[in-house]
């Protein structure tokens, strides 16, 4: 059975993510222990809330370097602020440095007129590469659940695995080698979200 380290650095409710991963067949360790993370087959890097708190929580838990190393040697799924933290910086709070694994920045939604920010609720996701194993058995334009005021803007367009429209078209998933990341919350996205988590559990790289 696939053993997944679900990173716990004080950001958000990990219960729903842990239960969803267990539901699709994973053994889950909710942990910030570098030794357990190193032993895991795969890593899920969640995150909700503010980027500054996210970066501070990782640093205080001593797992920022663990994450930097993990993305090069085992399958990683980053979710919401976890995905945003992979880029170089965020506009939040006047500018917050992030992990810098990928070139690019995290931008705040502009004034979208009649559309409210944060972007909260269900929205369609367009898969740039439906053949990617993480999209197995997920229909094009399936709906996923979002809660965010910021979105990622990677410098390399070939990192973009999916997009979404909310007043503007924005990147909602990125991928490179053994890493996949989503702005939406698969653990809150019912059938399509559970399928994506199942695909991650079964993803052989």
Curated annotation (Swiss-Prot):
It is found in: Cytoplasm. It catalyses: 5-[(5-phospho-1-deoxy-D-ribulos-1-ylimino)methylamino]-1-(5-phospho-beta-D-ribosyl)imidazole-4-carboxamide + L-glutamine = D-erythro-1-(imidazol-4-yl)glycerol 3-phosphate + 5-amino-1-(5-phospho-beta-D-ribosyl)imidazole-4-carboxamide + L-glutamate + H(+); L-glutamine + H2O = L-glutamate + NH4(+). Residues 3-205 form the Glutamine amidotransferase type-1 domain. GO terms for biological process: L-histidine biosynthetic process. It holds the Pfam family GATase. GO terms for cellular component: cytoplasm. Keywords: Amino-acid biosynthesis, Cytoplasm, Glutamine amidotransferase, Histidine biosynthesis, Hydrolase, Lyase. InterPro entries: Class_I_gatase-like (IPR029062), GATASE (IPR017926), Imidazole-glycPsynth_HisH (IPR010139). Heterodimer of HisH and HisF. This is Imidazole glycerol phosphate synthase subunit HisH. It comes from Acinetobacter baylyi (strain ATCC 33305 / BD413 / ADP1). The lineage of its organism: Bacteria, Pseudomonadati, Pseudomonadota, Gammaproteobacteria, Moraxellales.
């Amino acid at each position: 059975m696939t053993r997944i380290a679900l990173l716990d650095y004080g950001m958000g409710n990990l219960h729903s993510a842990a239960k969803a991963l267990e539901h699709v067949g994973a053994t889950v360790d909710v942990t910030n222990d570098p030794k357990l993370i190193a032993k895991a087959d795969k890593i899920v890097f969640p995150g909700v809330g503010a980027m500054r708190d996210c970066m501070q929580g990782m640093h205080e838990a001593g797992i920022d370097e663990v994450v930097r190393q993990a993305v090069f040697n085992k399958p990683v799924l980053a979710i919401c602020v976890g995905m945003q933290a992979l880029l170089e910086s965020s506009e939040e709070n006047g500018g917050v440095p992030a992990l810098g694994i990928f070139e690019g920045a995290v931008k705040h939604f502009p004034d979208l007129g009649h559309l409210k920010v944060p972007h909260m609720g269900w929205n369609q996701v367009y898969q740039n590469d439906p053949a990617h194993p993480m999209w197995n058995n997920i229909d094009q334009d399936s709906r996923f659940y979002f809660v965010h005021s910021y979105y990622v803007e990677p410098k390399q367009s070939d990192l973009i695995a999916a997009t979404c429209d909310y007043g503007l078209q924005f990147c909602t998933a990125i991928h490179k080698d053994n890493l996949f990341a989503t702005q939406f919350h698969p653990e809150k996205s019912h059938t399509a979200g559970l399928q994506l988590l199942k695909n991650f559990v079964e993803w052989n790289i």
